[in-house]
Each structure stands twice: as C-alpha cells, then as structure tokens.
Design a protein with these regions (language model features):
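Conserved N-terminal segment of class I S-adenosyl-L-methionine
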Residues: 1-105, 115-118, 197-202, 210-214, ...
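Residues lining the SAM
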Residues: 105-108, 134
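A short glycine-rich, Lys/Arg-flanked "PGG" loop and its adjoining helix->strand segment in the class I
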Residues: 115-130
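Short, glycine-/aromatic-enriched active-site segment of Class I SAM-dependent methyltransferases
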Residues: 131-153, 157-163
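Conserved S-adenosyl-L-methionine
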Residues: 168-179
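C-terminal helical/coil "lid" or tail adjacent to the Rossmann-like core of SAM-dependent
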Residues: 180-209
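Core SAM-dependent methyltransferase catalytic element
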Residues: 186-192, 222-234
Length: 234
C-alpha cells in the first residue's frame, strides 16, 4: 500500500456524487452542532456533508499533505468557514474536545485497532451525541483491492456491533447499495479487477446508485455492499 495509491483512490471516488448524496441524505439529520469527521482525506466528503449550518466541523486527517489541502479549501471558500483542518488522529485530541457527532465515512476499516479507536471516539462524544459509521460490508467481498488500499477488514452487522462500546445505544444499522453489491460479486467472481477505472466508478455512480436508492427501501435495507450504523451516547 502506498499513499499515492490511496490518494488516487480518494480522487476517483470523490467523483461519486450520487453515492455521497445518497448516504448524506440518510445521515444528515445527525450532523448538527460540533462535528468531528475522522479521516477527512482530501475533503470530498466534507464538501457534501458540511453545509455550513454546523457550529464547528473538524476535519481530522493523519496525512499532513491531505490536511494541508483541506486547509487550502477552507481558505479559498470551497469548504464552509465552520470547517477546521486538524492533522492527527482521535488519540491527539485533548480532553477539551467534545462533539455532538463523530463521523467515520469509509475510514474505520483502515484502522487496525478499531475497538480502541471507537472507545476513544465515545469519550469525545457529548451526552446524546451520535456516532456515525459507513464502511464496506461483508468480509466475503474482500478482494486484493481492499488490501492494496489499506483495508484491514469489511464489516457485517455482527462484526460491527462487536466493536461498538457498550455505553452507546444503537439507533440504526442497515446496508446500502444492493445493486452495487451484485456488481461487486460479479467483479470478485468474474472480472477480478483491482483498482477501478474512472469509467467504472462513473457507471456505478450514475447508473447503479439511482437503482439502489429505489430498491434499498423495498428490501428494508437488508442488502448492500456498504454498512451504515448510527449510535447515540446515553
């Protein structure tokens, strides 16, 4: 795994505007007040989820170059003024930091010790605050591409629940992108491709995601290649 490879992946998936808008609509109501986005990358997700109504939106990113790029976007107005770029991890935040929402969008699977990570995150949540996690689903869909971009795992409902601190109460746990899951199965069994091309990302985002947006509710969000979990601190 290289940082340039991961950077290429981030730039590719930054074009997945339908996908970001889809999950954004599901979680947006939880993103108010003081928000911490862990692993903010190049700011592509921040641009979709942060609409400027929040009191503070901390873009926490361990890669110094990516964190600097986020700071540039704040300064040039690409990101709302409530955004704040910080270089580091949750372990670097001090006791004064408390958040109404903590968001992991395609990040937790990159963290080797996810149990310890989420315990620290729970400490940073205010009472009644929300933890929001979106990650790749189903370990049986794990491919060499997952390993190349630094994924330690993919999650099922069971495996994700096992790493959530017991002091958090489950609000929602579901799967998203049922049509994309079928495409992923086809890729794993037939194509066996590694890094997706820009054309493949565009096809998935423009053709398959609209279908998933229609079909997922009909399936009660029981199938999908991504898992979404929301918990509240009580």
């Amino acid at each position: 795994m290289t940082s340039s490879y991961i950077g290429s992946e981030l730039h590719l998936f930054s074009k997945a505007t339908n996908w970001k808008a889809y999950y954004g609509r599901v979680i947006k109501k939880y993103l108010a007040g003081d928000v911490l986005e862990v692993g903010a990358g190049i700011g592509a997700t921040s641009r979709v989820l942060c609409d400027g109504s929040q009191r503070k939106w901390v873009c926490l990113e361990p890669d110094a170059a990516m964190s600097a790029a986020i700071q540039e976007q704040i300064e040039d107005g690409s990101l709302p003024v409530c955004c704040e770029a910080r270089n580091g991890t949750v372990a670097d935040l001090n006791g004064a930091d408390r958040f109404d929402a903590i968001v992991y969008i395609d990040v937790l699977e990159h963290i080797e010790n996810d149990v310890d990570e989420l315990s620290k995150a729970a400490d940073l949540l205010k009472e009644a605050g929300h933890l929001v996690i979106l990650s790749p689903a189903h370990q049986w869909l794990y491919t060499p591409f997952d390993g190349e971009i630094g994924h330690y795992r993919r999650y099922s409902k069971k495996s994700l629940l096992e790493v959530i601190p017991p002091r958090l109460r489950r609000v929602e746990l579901c799967y998203l992108d049922s049509v994309g899951m079928l495409a992923s199965i086809g890729n794993k069994m037939l194509l066996k491709s590694s890094m997706p091309t820009a054309g493949q990302i565009s096809f998935w985002d423009k053709r398959l995601i609209p279908l998933s947006m229609f079909i997922d509710p009909l399936l009660l969000r029981r199938l999908g290649k991504s898992i979404l979990g929301i918990w509240s601190k009580t």
